[in-house]
Amino acid sequence: MAKMMEPRFKLSRSLGVNIYGHPKAMQRAGKTAGRASKKLSSYGLQLLEKQKLRAYYGVLEKQFVIYVEKAMKASGLSGEALIQSLECRLDNMVYRMGFASSIREARQMVNHGHILVNGKKVDRPSYPIQVDDAVALRERSQKIEKYLSNLKNTTINFDYIETDVSSFTGRLLRIPNREEIPVEVNEQLVIEFYSKK
């Protein structure tokens, strides 16, 4: 299976944003975070935003293009449709619901068969979660200490997601509004990047 192989912290620094949420992600060895940034061209800004959005959700280029093409055909703002579809991927929902400490860990959980959707095992990270879908930790996986710890220590809640710790289940209540999605990116520039191709 294809993977994004660039070291996570290095990728965060090159994009200028902490896409993994780790407190040390933006630090260089022996240096403080941050450096003077050169002024980017219009194309450079669009490319940067595209790279940031791909990195946030861990999506490879070939699959990302499919999301963009679908978003361009959707009604309303294409950029908003793009980020909403990425937000509702199964691996991201597993992360947002608190089962995993990162999207990378969530993707591994899905790949290894730990996750059920509406009572059935789904091992495809890109599986699109629909409103009212129930996402659950498989019964035998509920005894894995790391997953228990992740769920119990989750401190961030989202209004568009409901999580029941006692039943190891989460549910997408509605499609999130753009301002509710905690991703620092100008998604409209991403659409502009691909619309010129």
Curated annotation (Swiss-Prot):
Keywords (A to Z) from UniProt: Ribonucleoprotein, Ribosomal protein, RNA-binding, rRNA-binding
GO MF assignments: rRNA binding; structural constituent of ribosome
Stretches assigned to coiled coil: none
Any single Pfam family the record assigns to this protein: Ribosomal_S4
GO cellular component, one term: small ribosomal subunit
Domain annotation S4 RNA-binding: ranges: 88-153
Entry's Gene Ontology BP terms: ribosomal small subunit biogenesis; translation
InterPro entries reported in the protein's UniProt record: Ribosomal_uS4, Ribosomal_uS4_bac-type, Ribosomal_uS4_CS, Ribosomal_uS4_N, S4_RNA-bd, S4_RNA-bd_sf
UniProt keyword Ribosomal protein present: yes
SMART domains linked: Ribosomal_S4, S4
Superkingdom, taxonomy of origin: Bacteria
PANTHER family xrefs: 30S 40S RIBOSOMAL PROTEIN (PTHR11831), SMALL RIBOSOMAL SUBUNIT PROTEIN US4M (PTHR11831:SF4)
Family: Belongs to the universal ribosomal protein uS4 family.
Functional description taken from the UniProt entry: One of the primary rRNA binding proteins, it binds directly to 16S rRNA where it nucleates assembly of the body of the 30S subunit.
Subunit record text: Part of the 30S ribosomal subunit. Contacts protein S5. The interaction surface between S4 and S5 is involved in control of translational fidelity.
Name assigned to this protein: Small ribosomal subunit protein uS4B
Organism this protein belongs to: Alkaliphilus oremlandii (strain OhILAs)
